[in-house]
C-alpha cells in the first residue's frame, strides 16, 4: 500500500507539471514574419500555384501569404464587380486548406482608396459606381504616360462619399469570410488623388486627416470581427524630408497621418532600390512593421539582415514591433512562375524580367540560412 501511494503521488505530481511545448524554430525569434505578397492566381493556374506554395514557400519557412485578389473573385454580394473568370469559393478553399495545413497565415488584399485604375483602364469599383470617383473630370481613356498635365497615375474613390463604404465593406467582409482571414490588406499606396478641388466633399480638407480617417474607418470595421488591417507605408513617410520622393513616400502631406491612425495597423514598408531604414521609424511610432523588397537581390538580402539586426539591437518594446520581411511580386502569377523557373534553370531565362524571380530565390536562401 505504501508503495502504491508513493507511485500515485509521483503520478499526480507529474500530471500537475505544465505540458512541454515544442521548441520554437530559431528563425521565429530572429524574424517572426516571413511573407510573400503576390497576385492571386487565375483559375487555370491553381494547380501550379498550390505546387509553388508547397514546394517553394513551405520549405523556406514562409509563414505569411498576401494575395492581391481585388476584383478577381466571384463576389455574391456584388456580382457586378467581378472580373472575367474570377476565382470561385471552391478555388479559394483549396488555397486556404493548403496554407492552413502548412502554418501559413493567408491574407487577402483589395486595393482601397487609391489604385482604382491603371493606365487607360478603370477598375471595377469606379467603372460600376462612377459617382464614387474623387475627380470624375479626369478620364482614364485620355491617359498618355507619366508625368502628364492632369497628374493621372491611378484613380481614387472619394473617402467621404456617403455610399462608398456600404459597397466596399460588403466585398471586404465576403472575401475575408471565404478566406477565413484574421487580417486584410487594403493597399492604400501611391494615393495621389485625395482632397481634390472638384470633389464637393473633400475640397479644402486636410489630406492627412482624410487619409487617416479612411485608414481608421477600415481598421475599425475589421476590428469588429477581430481582424487586423495591413497597408503599405509610403503615404505615411515625408518624401521631401527623407529624400524618398513621391512614390516610396508622400509629397501631398498625407505623411502626418502617421500620428493619427490606430497603433495596431500593420505597416508594409516597401523600398525597392535601397535598403532604406524607415522600418525603425514606424516601430518607434508604435506601429507593427515589416520591411518589403522586390527585384534587387542584394537589397532584399540586406533588408532581411537589417531587420534581424534591428530586432537584436532594440529595446524589447520596439523589437516586438519590428516584425520581419515581406517579399513582393508585381506581375501575374503565371509570368512570374516562368521567370522563377528560369532563375532555377528550369526554363529559358528572360533577361528583361529576371531580377524579381532571382530576388525571391535570394530571399529563400537567406530565410533557409537563418533557420539553420
Model-derived features with residue positions:
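Catalytic-core regions of glycoside hydrolase
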Residues: 63, 178, 182, 193, ...
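Flexible loop residues that form catalytic
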Residues: 9, 41, 70, 272, ...
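Aromatic-lined carbohydrate-binding surfaces of glycoside hydrolases
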Residues: 37-251, 257-259, 265
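Histidine-centered catalytic/metal-binding microenvironments
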Residues: 372
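Positively charged n-region of N-terminal signal peptides that target proteins for export
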Residues: 1-4, 18
